[in-house]
Amino acid sequence: MPPINIEAARRIQERLARQVTYAPLPPVETVAGLDVAYSGSLAFGAAVVVKRTTLEVVETACSVSRIVVPYVPTFLAFRELTPMLRAYIKLKSKPDVILVDGHGVAHPRRFGIASHIGVVLKKPTIGVAKSRLYGEEVGDKLVDPATGEVLALIIKCGGKKYVSVGSYATLDEAAGLVAQLCKSGDVYPLRLAHELANKLKKAHLPDDKDRDSCP
């Protein structure tokens, strides 16, 4: 696996971060969760669309991709973008909002994986992370220590969830929507995507002909 070119990746993030858009969410009827699981040299992407009000599953899609980029902190998108997008583009029913297992603007360069996906797809995206990547916790907020800017809101859904804008959303609306989607101690669309990605990983065989089928 070739190493990532850190400086080139940093420049890409800094350039694309200027395209992050803060805007009110559209009317939200459906929400997708995106996640990735790993086994050996393969990445298993999952997308699960649910109805916002009932949490009923509308559609699922999966992908299997070869890992071509190692994990490097703050550059997660360069590893997970491909499996997530390959699953997402297979969805027939495109969701109103996308939740991503990772950060949005709560990132040193304001461009975590949720922002990357939002800019690429030009869709409302929200980052939901279980751990802090950048910033200082002040009450229920994650704040940039240099500027005082609020990067994320911290909600309790099981444990802490750090909710940040990916793109085409506002922070208050993003946190409010994620709180609505909390069920049984987790953000439900993301839990379903996590479970599906791991189920695909366990079911996958090296000689599978239909590699991308959800189990």
UniProtKB/Swiss-Prot annotation:
Domain of life: Archaea
EC code: 3.1.21.7
Reaction catalyzed: Endonucleolytic cleavage at apurinic or apyrimidinic sites to products with a 5'-phosphate
Cofactor(s) recorded in Swiss-Prot or TrEMBL: Mg(2+)
One Gene Ontology term, aspect cellular component: cytoplasm
UniProt xrefs under InterPro entries: Endonuclease-V
GO MF terms held by the record: deoxyribonuclease V activity; magnesium ion binding; RNA endonuclease activity, producing 5'-phosphomonoesters; single-stranded RNA binding
Site (Interaction with target DNA): 71
Subcellular location: Cytoplasm
Major localization listed first in the record, in broad terms: cytoplasm
A biological-process GO annotation: DNA repair
Keywords per UniProt: Cytoplasm, DNA damage, DNA repair, Endonuclease, Hydrolase, Magnesium, Metal-binding, Nuclease
Function noted in UniProt: DNA repair enzyme involved in the repair of deaminated bases. Selectively cleaves double-stranded DNA at the second phosphodiester bond 3' to a deoxyinosine leaving behind the intact lesion on the nicked DNA.
Family: Belongs to the endonuclease V family.
Protein name: Endonuclease V
Species, as recorded: Pyrobaculum aerophilum (strain ATCC 51768 / DSM 7523 / JCM 9630 / CIP 104966 / NBRC 100827 / IM2)
Source species taxonomy: Archaea, Thermoproteota, Thermoprotei, Thermoproteales, Thermoproteaceae
Gene field: nfi
